[in-house]
């Protein structure tokens, strides 16, 4: 939808990162974000080299701000930089044009 906010995270885990703890925190973050007003969806894709792309969709910048400033999310982001990620970046994008949805039979 026009005006939606899309956040793309491109992150790579450290070789020394605890995958079990990372997965546990990811599940907790999903519990939180999925209950916030304006959250629409999240999907993650992992490449063979360990790079992970995550795409969040929010109804508005205000909805994203609820997530960005949530205390548990803030602490998890801090831990991510300190314990889990070797590199990465986030992009925050606003939908300005949309084609579809469409379905081929």
Residue positions per predicted region:
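Alpha-helical structural motif
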Residues: 25, 76-77
């Amino acid at each position: 939808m026009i005006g939606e906010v899309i956040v793309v995270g491109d992150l790579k885990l450290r070789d020394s990162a605890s995958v079990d703890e990372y997965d546990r925190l990811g599940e907790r973050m999903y519990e939180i974000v999925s209950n916030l007003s304006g959250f629409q969806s999240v999907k993650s894709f992992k490449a063979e080299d360990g790079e992970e792309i995550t795409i969040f969709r929010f109804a508005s910048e205000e909805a994203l701000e609820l997530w960005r400033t949530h205390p548990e999310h803030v602490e998890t982001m801090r831990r991510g930089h300190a314990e889990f990620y070797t590199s990465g970046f986030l992009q925050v994008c606003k939908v300005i044009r949309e084609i579809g949805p469409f379905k081929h039979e």
